[in-house]
Amino acid sequence: MSQISYKDAGVDIDAGNSFVENIKPLVKATFTPHVLGGIGSFAGAYELPTGYKEPVMLAATDGVGTKLKLAIDSGNHSTVGIDLVAMCVNDLICNFGTPSFFLDYYATGKLDVSAATSVVAGIAEGCKQAECSLIGGETAEMPGMYSEDDYDLAGFAVGVAEKSELDRVSLVKEGDVLIALPSSGFHSNGFSLVRKVLFEKLRMKFDDDFNGRPLIDVLLEPTRIYVKLFKALKENIVAMAHITGGGIVENLPRVLPDHLYAEVQKASIRPLPIFELLKEHVDETEMYRAFNMGVGMVLVVRPENVDAVLKGSDGYLIGTVKTGEKCVKLS
């Protein structure tokens, strides 16, 4: 009677070991002196940074959504790891946390060592941009749960904040100014609608030219990471809103008290050309709910600090905070 191996059941331990060897130098390149120990332990260890009066640990988790489908179908896995880090650390800094370390979860039907290595290379690059360390991860090969070519990602960012700086909402006042930090594209939201319009309705192809670039490169442009800008501008920022799913209209109110609303001048927003293409086929109200419309982060700033923020960033004015029921008014 023949014996059945784990590999026969669809799980290749040797491939997993090969993958780990591939990513070791990528992971180590993100380490700072705060990382204790090496790779291969049961848990990652990170020495808490000093200099805080009342340090508070912050954690954020997210994924990349159906942008992964474009990476899988195009065979370009090099940027979605950056997206994964960005979606987590950009949330973290909105609570005035400084990212310390990152962990990832990679699940697939059949481990493609080359593709997985490319993904982790992107995660490592994202960690470098966010100035945090990749100290752990899990690779799950699950035949029957996913098709062989599919994979999914989840990320987990942990950072430190000063306890006294956590409550940003109560600091927002009437007359505060709204500054938009540009996005690099769709970031990691709205791709189900993007795919519906571009590939089902318009029958576009990955290699179609769009503004001098292959369309797929425009769509897979990685999410911008705002950590370094946050660190540079922190003293001049009252609050920050990461513009993700729900767009400006649903994310900006998250940093407003109940008695204040944000008046945003729609004409001041600078959508990228790819958004203009979508606008021809999607209602404008839906556009502002599904996409960031070229705005990756909104900063709430005191009027006297506006010049310093504008000089220290590529941001631009989009509105003000006014008294009234909490909402966003696009005018």
Description of each model-found segment:
Residues 25, 31-184:
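Glycine-rich phosphate/pyrophosphate-binding loop regions near the starts of catalytic domains
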Residues 18-20, 68, 102, 110, ...:
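Generic hydrophobic alpha-helical membrane-span motif
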Residues 110, 188, 272:
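Loop/helix-junction capping segments adjacent to catalytic residues or to phosphate/diphosphate-binding pockets
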